[in-house]
């Protein structure tokens, strides 16, 4: 029996409708949630991502401010702009679109954002708080993945979650979020021995490595939930994930497609964090 599709597009639509109501309520209280987005250079993918984020903000009533700078700006100049936004009480969230040019240290930039405005959830203080279970802004893609799995109404407690990939943005934090939900978590990466033997043990398999169709049905246990975070463009121009969708859907119980899987939830959780930031800063 083929897997049921986890439609991230529809889930995102439902969550955004809820967020739009929260924004309306905040505005009635005299609070207009606002997100500042910084874009450095003219990288086409970055421009596309920023456009999508701004459109999503507009749809639910969040004010978004775009600051664009040329590729050759200095790190000190960028840090000055962030410092200014940190002090601006009308701005509740700050997002710097990555990657940045080579002359700018990304960690310096992330650390410069005030933790209470770090709606990407990348600041070391937010990461640390997440690790020990304190209230924090959670990184958007991992948070979106957890939301998707929870939407299935499955009991996560005691489930074996296998995460393929160990990036700071997805792999590491998503494992921590499931650990907080009392799952048993295993991390796999490029140096893992016998990857297939480990992934076949997963009740929930999360793949985020950027290798087209790496995971086939032989890597997946019958009835597993499969979350595909990868977005890869094939030579024919089509998008595909890290999971061979047509093959794996024959054995999984639930699976996310690419596109319209995890992607829409990432932006939705950015909106969620921005609304939360506005509420927290006006307590």
From Swiss-Prot:
Family the UniProt entry places it in: Belongs to the tetrahydrofolate dehydrogenase/cyclohydrolase family.
Biological role: Catalyzes the oxidation of 5,10-methylenetetrahydrofolate to 5,10-methenyltetrahydrofolate and then the hydrolysis of 5,10-methenyltetrahydrofolate to 10-formyltetrahydrofolate.
Protein name: Bifunctional protein FolD
Classification via Gene3D superfamilies: Leucine Dehydrogenase, chain A, domain 1 (3.40.50.10860), NAD(P)-binding Rossmann-like Domain (3.40.50.720)
Xref: PANTHER family: C-1-TETRAHYDROFOLATE SYNTHASE, CYTOPLASMIC, C-1-TETRAHYDROFOLATE SYNTHASE, CYTOPLASMIC-RELATED
Binding residues for NADP(+): 165-167, 190, 231
Chemical reaction(s) catalysed: (6R)-5,10-methylene-5,6,7,8-tetrahydrofolate + NADP(+) = (6R)-5,10-methenyltetrahydrofolate + NADPH; (6R)-5,10-methenyltetrahydrofolate + H2O = (6R)-10-formyltetrahydrofolate + H(+)
UniProt cross-references to PROSITE patterns, sorted A to Z: THF_DHG_CYH_2 (PS00767)
Assembly mode: Homodimer.
Keyword Amino-acid biosynthesis appears in the UniProt entry: yes
Keywords, alphabetical: Amino-acid biosynthesis, Histidine biosynthesis, Hydrolase, Methionine biosynthesis, Multifunctional enzyme, NADP, One-carbon metabolism, Oxidoreductase, Purine biosynthesis
GO-annotated cellular components: cytosol
Pathway(s) it belongs to: One-carbon metabolism; tetrahydrofolate interconversion
GO MF annotation terms: methenyltetrahydrofolate cyclohydrolase activity; methylenetetrahydrofolate dehydrogenase (NADP+) activity
Keyword Hydrolase tagged: yes
Species annotation: Anoxybacillus flavithermus (strain DSM 21510 / WK1)
CDD domains: NAD_bind_m-THF_DH_Cyclohyd
GO biological process: L-histidine biosynthetic process; methionine biosynthetic process; purine nucleotide biosynthetic process; tetrahydrofolate interconversion
Highest taxon listed in the record's lineage: Bacteria
EC number: 1.5.1.5, 3.5.4.9
């Amino acid at each position: 029996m083929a897997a049921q599709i986890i439609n991230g597009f529809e889930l995102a639509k439902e969550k955004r409708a809820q967020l739009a109501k929260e924004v309306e309520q905040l505005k009635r209280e005299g609070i207009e949630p606002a997100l500042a987005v910084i874009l450095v250079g003219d990288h086409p993918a970055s421009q596309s991502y920023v456009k999508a984020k701004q459109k999503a903000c507009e749809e639910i009533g969040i004010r978004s401010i775009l600051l664009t700078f040329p590729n050759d700006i200095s790190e000190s100049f960028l840090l000055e702009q962030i410092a200014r936004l940190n002090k601006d009480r009308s701005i509740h969230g700050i997002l710097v679109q990555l990657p940045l040019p080579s002359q700018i240290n990304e960690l310096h930039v992330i650390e410069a954002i005030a933790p209470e405005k770090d709606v990407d959830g990348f600041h070391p203080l937010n990461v640390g708080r997440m690790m020990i279970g304190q209230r924090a802004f959670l990184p958007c893609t991992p948070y979106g993945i957890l939301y998707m799995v929870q939407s299935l109404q499955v009991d996560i407690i005691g489930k074996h979650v296998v995460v393929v990939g160990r990036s700071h943005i997805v792999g590491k934090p998503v494992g921590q979020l499931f650990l907080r939900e009392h799952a048993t978590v295993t991390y796999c990466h490029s140096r893992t021995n016998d990857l297939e033997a480990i992934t076949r043990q997963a009740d929930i398999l999360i793949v985020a490595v950027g290798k087209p169709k790496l995971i086939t049905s032989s890597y997946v246990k019958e009835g597993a939930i499969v979350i595909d975070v990868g977005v890869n463009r094939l030579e024919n121009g089509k998008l595909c994930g890290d999971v061979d969708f047509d093959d794996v859907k024959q054995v999984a119980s639930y699976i996310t497609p690419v596109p319209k899987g995890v992607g829409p939830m990432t932006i939705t959780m950015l909106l969620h964090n921005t609304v939360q930031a506005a509420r927290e800063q006006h307590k």
